[in-house]
């Protein structure tokens, strides 16, 4: 299935997901180059909510740009299979050798505002990440490493603690809390 088909098959968890899914579907139809950063207004990203085998821990990275503990993930950069993106980013940003999808279906959807910032010496205007999240599982005993150009820490947290260490109120209260609520229903 392509992304549009996956999104149409996905049952939104709440109103935020329902509205964001509709926005993403509209942008897939109406916006050019949403799978690349050439579209400076909106573009696709994939995130990974990474849990250990018994679902008692969540992996977070201390994100240099946001100065907060956050999920792992990144830009599609031309890749239309966002599960591939989520897995690649999980490995690159954490050093995990053993990471796999808990399920191949979409776990969550979000349209996320990104404030203007400087990246690699260039100003990047405020824009929206059209984000698809996948639930991944990793071996908590795998060695972890920092990807210095993106993060300055990688660590496992209890799910509630993963919410608490995030200093971004919207992400903590509306995204990470939702992901953990969904985790409890599996």
What is each model feature region?
Residues 77-170:
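Unchanged
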Residues 11-47:
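Acidic, metal-coordinating catalytic segment for phosphate/diphosphate chemistry
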């Amino acid at each position: 299935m392509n992304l549009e088909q996956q999104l149409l098959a996905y049952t939104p968890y709440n109103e935020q997901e329902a509205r964001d899914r509709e926005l993403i579907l509209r942008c897939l139809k109406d916006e050019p180059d949403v799978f690349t950063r050439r579209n400076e207004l909106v573009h696709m990203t994939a995130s990974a909510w990474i849990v250990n085998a018994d679902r008692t821990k969540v992996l977070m990275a201390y994100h240099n740009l946001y100065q907060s503990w956050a999920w792992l993930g990144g830009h599609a950069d031309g890749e239309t299979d966002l599960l591939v993106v989520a897995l690649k980013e999980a490995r690159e940003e954490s050093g995990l050798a053993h990471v796999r999808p808990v399920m191949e279906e979409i776990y969550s959807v979000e349209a996320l505002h990104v404030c203007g910032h400087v990246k690699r010496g260039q100003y990047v205007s405020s824009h929206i990440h059209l984000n698809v999240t996948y639930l991944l599982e990793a071996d908590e005993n795998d060695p972890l490493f920092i990807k210095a150009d993106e993060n300055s820490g990688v660590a496992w947290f209890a799910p509630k603690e993963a919410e608490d260490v995030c200093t971004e109120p919207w992400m903590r209260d509306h995204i990470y809390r939702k992901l953990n609520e969904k985790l409890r229903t599996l």
